[in-house]
C-alpha cells in the first residue's frame, strides 16, 4: 500500500487521509467569537489562508474491503475536487471502492459522487448514510423553507441519491464491517454521522464535521458555523464527543482537520487543544 498520504493502522485496517483540496469561506460564518479573535487564532496556527476550509476524505482498506468516507466536493469547487487524482495516486480506481460512507450530505461531502455529466463515479459501490439524513433532504417542507442556496443543495442531494438509488443503504446501528461502527453525531445536520474503528487498544474516530476551523472550535467548542442545521445541538455534540475523545484517548480524523488528517485531542483551559504531532 502506498504511503504518499498520512495514514494510520488500526488492527487490520489502514486508514489514509486523502485531500480533496480546499473551499473558500469566511470567518464571518462563525458565531460565538469575534472575527478578529478568530483571525488571531488562525494566524497563530500559521495558516496562509486563514478563512479557507480544507476538505479531507478517508480511505479504509483491509479485510478485503475498500471503503471511502465521503467523496469531497468534486466539480463543485474550483479549489477542490482532487479526490480522484489522489485515489489514483494510492493505486485505487473508483470501480474498486465497494462502499462509500457519508458523514452527511453537504456539497463538499457528496459533490464527488457525480461526474461533470452527473453520472455516478463509484458505480460498484454501496452508498451508506443515516436514515435521518435522507429524510431531511427529501422533505419537501424543508425544501420550501430553504433559501436559494439551500434549495440548490436540496436539488444536488436529491439528484445524487436518485443516481445511486439502486445502491443506497442506511445505517442501522450495527457494524459496517467488523470493527467499524457508525456513530450518530447530530446537529451539523440531522443525520450527521462519524465512524469509529476499534482494534486491540486503539480507537480512531472519523468525526465528520464536528469542526470546520479546528484550531478555533477546539479551543472554543461553543463556536458554531452558519452551515449547522441546529447550532445548539451541534455545540452539545461537539463538547460531548471532544470530552469522550479525551477520556477514551481516541485518535481523531476529520473532514476539515487539514492536510495532516489525524490529531489527538487534549483538555486545555476551558476548551481543548488538537495536536497533530502527538498521535
Q: Where are the model-predicted features located?
A:
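Histidine-centered catalytic micro-motifs
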Residues: 100-110, 185-192, 253-260
Amino acid at each position: 500500500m502506498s504511503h504518499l498520504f498520512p495514514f494510520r493502522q488500526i488492527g487490520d485496517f489502514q486508514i489514509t487521509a486523502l485531500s480533496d483540496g480546499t473551499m473558500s469561506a469566511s470567518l464571518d460564518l462563525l458565531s460565538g467569537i469575534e472575527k478578529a479573535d478568530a483571525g488571531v487564532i488562525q494566524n497563530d496556527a500559521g495558516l496562509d489562508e486563514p478563512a479557507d476550509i480544507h476538505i479531507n476524505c478517508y480511505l479504509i482498506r483491509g479485510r478485503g474491503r475498500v471503503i471511502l468516507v465521503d467523496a469531497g466536493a468534486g466539480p463543485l469547487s474550483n479549489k477542490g475536487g482532487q479526490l480522484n487524482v489522489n485515489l489514483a495516486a494510492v493505486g485505487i480506481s473508483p470501480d474498486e471502492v465497494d462502499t462509500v460512507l457519508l458523514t452527511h450530505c453537504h456539497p463538499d461531502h457528496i459533490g464527488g459522487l457525480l461526474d461533470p455529466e452527473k453520472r455516478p463515479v463509484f458505480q460498484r459501490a454501496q452508498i451508506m448514510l443515516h436514515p435521518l439524513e435522507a429524510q431531511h433532504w427529501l422533505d419537501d417542507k424543508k425544501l420550501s423553507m430553504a433559501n436559494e442556496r439551500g434549495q440548490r443543495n436540496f436539488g444536488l442531494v436529491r439528484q445524487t441519491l436518485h443516481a445511486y438509488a439502486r445502491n443506497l443503504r442506511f445505517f442501522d446501528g450495527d457494524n459496517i464491517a467488523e470493527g467499524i461502527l457508525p456513530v450518530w453525531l447530530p446537529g451539523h445536520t440531522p443525520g450527521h454521522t462519524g465512524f469509529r474503528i476499534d482494534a486491540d487498544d486503539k480507537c480512531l474516530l472519523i468525526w465528520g464535521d464536528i469542526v470546520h476551523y479546528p484550531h478555533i472550535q477546539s479551543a472554543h467548542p461553543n463556536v458554531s458555523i452558519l452551515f449547522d442545521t441546529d447550532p445548539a445541538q451541534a455545540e452539545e455534540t461537539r463538547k460531548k464527543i471532544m470530552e469522550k475523545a479525551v477520556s477514551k484517548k481516541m485518535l481523531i480524523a476529520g473532514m476539515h482537520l487539514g492536510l495532516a488528517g489525524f490529531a489527538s485531542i487534549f483538555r486545555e483551559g476551558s476548551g481543548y487543544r488538537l495536536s497533530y504531532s502527538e498521535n
